Every structure is written in C-alpha cells, then in structure tokens.
Design a protein with these regions (language model features):
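Sec-dependent signal peptide recognition
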Residues: 2-9
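Residue-level signal for mature regions of secreted extracellular proteins and peptides
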Residues: 9-10, 227
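C-terminal motif of bacterial Sec signal peptides marking the signal peptidase cleavage site
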Residues: 12-15
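Activation targets extended, charge/polar-rich intrinsically disordered C-terminal tails
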Residues: 17-18, 141-235
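Non-catalytic ligand/cofactor/substrate-binding and regulatory segments of enzyme domains
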Residues: 22-36, 40-43, 51-166, 234
C-alpha cells in the first residue's frame, strides 16, 4: 500500500511536466472559431477527429498511409494495453502503475465524425485558426520522431483503416489517454485543468458543463471557445 501511495504521489508531482507537453498560448483565445474538430468517446477512451489536410502536410507519412481522406481520428495511450487482443488484469495494472511506452492510434474517417462513429459520443468544437494550429502542433508532437523528424509506423490499428505509431512520452496513472485529450484541449485554448482529467467521464462532463453554462448565458470559462453537441457546423 505504501509503495502504491508513493507511486501516486510521484505521479502527481511529475504529471504536469510529462510528454506530450501542453502547447502554451501567448495571446488571448478568440471568442468564435470557424475550424471544426471533434472530440470522440469510445467507452473509457477519448480522442480527436480533425480535418486531414493540414496534419498530413505536417506529417507526410500520414498522407502516404491514408491518402486523400477528409478526416483522421487520433488517440494516444499505453502501447501494450492499446494493442492487446485480450485485456488482462496484469496488463491493466502495468499500464496504470508503471510508466510504459505510448502509441498514437490514427484512423481514417471518410465522413463527419458523428456519422462515422454513430455508436460513440461525439462533440463538436469550433476553434480559431490560431487555436486549431496549436492543437495540430500538440498532436504532431505526440508522435515520436526519429533524428530525421520521421514518425514511426508500428502495427495496423484496431478498427477501420487504421495504424499505430510510436508515441512521445510514457503512459502511467497520471498521464492517461484522457489526460492527453485534456492537454489537447488546453493546447487549443480551452480553459481546462488537465491534472485530474484522467477518465472519459471527466472529459465529456467538462464539455457538457461548459455547454450548459453557455445555455445559461455565462460560460464560467472565459478562455474557452464554444462547444456544441454533434451534429453541429461551425460558422
């Protein structure tokens, strides 16, 4: 028990400085955005769906792998847990209690996310151009890159037309797939504190609370741009 407590304390102390790092802003966020991206929840996991063109320009191997597609879904997580054909208790404990290698899971999305992931929870986020660029930078920096700046392909992905890539940073108790999503939101200018955003519920609840605050006429999060439930189109 003392060992586990020590691990938790150390995790709390190091979580804010763990890769992938939040992209910090030097300007105030815009109130309205035109760049449409999606936050997707699959069970206990969350990730982003973004238009493919710009991220493929930044990471040409994505274009080589997926070709001319409208969107790509990105998720970050534990290498062993994410790629496992069978989830065991030992694998779960290892992923949670001990820093492990990470992967990026990239999925070709041929239509809008709310249609493609009809059985998942999907939210739409409207970003300004600067906020969108910052989110794409965060996603790009979530990939491990070799000395030539190339991303490294691993195994095929787990659903659809998908691929695993070697990730940047380690997965552990206080640096989970959902905290990665929170870091992405923070990088995009959303006023969210990633520290304890460790579960899918904590991410999606934040989105719902923010939407409710918008409905009441006061966001309570002055640095955030509008979120809506899909389907929704940014203006």
């Amino acid at each position: 028990m003392k060992v586990i407590l020590l691990i938790v304390i150390l995790s709390l102390l190091t979580a804010c400085s763990s890769k992938p790092y939040v992209i910090k802003h030097t300007e105030m966020p815009a109130a309205v955005g035109q760049e449409e991206i999606y936050i997707v929840r699959h069970g206990w996991h969350t990730g982003f769906v973004v238009p493919a063109k710009r991220i493929q320009n930044q990471l040409p191997k994505l274009r080589k792998r997926f070709g001319d597609i409208p969107y790509i879904e990105f998720g970050w997580g534990d290498k062993g847990f994410y790629q496992a054909k069978e989830i065991t208790k030992g694998l779960t404990l290892k992923a949670i209690l001990w820093p492990t290698e990470s992967v990026i899971h990239a999925v070709a999305v041929p239509v809008k996310a709310d249609k493609f992931f009809a059985n998942s929870i999907v939210e739409t986020l409207c970003l300004s151009g600067r906020e969108y660029s910052s989110l794409l930078r965060f996603i790009s920096e979530s990939f491990y890159k070799d000395e030539y700046g190339r991303i490294l392909e691993l195994e095929d992905g787990i659903y659809g037309n998908s691929q695993f890539y070697k990730g940047a940073g380690n997965f552990y108790l206080m640096n989970t797939c959902n905290k990665w999503t929170a870091k992405g939101l923070k990088s995009a200018g959303i006023d969210i504190s990633p520290t304890f955003k460790l579960t899918a519920d904590s991410i999606m609840d934040y989105v719902k609370e923010y939407r409710q605050a918008l409905t009441m006429g006061s966001t309570g999060h002055s640095k955030a741009t509008p979120l809506r439930s899909a389907p929704f189109e940014c203006q």
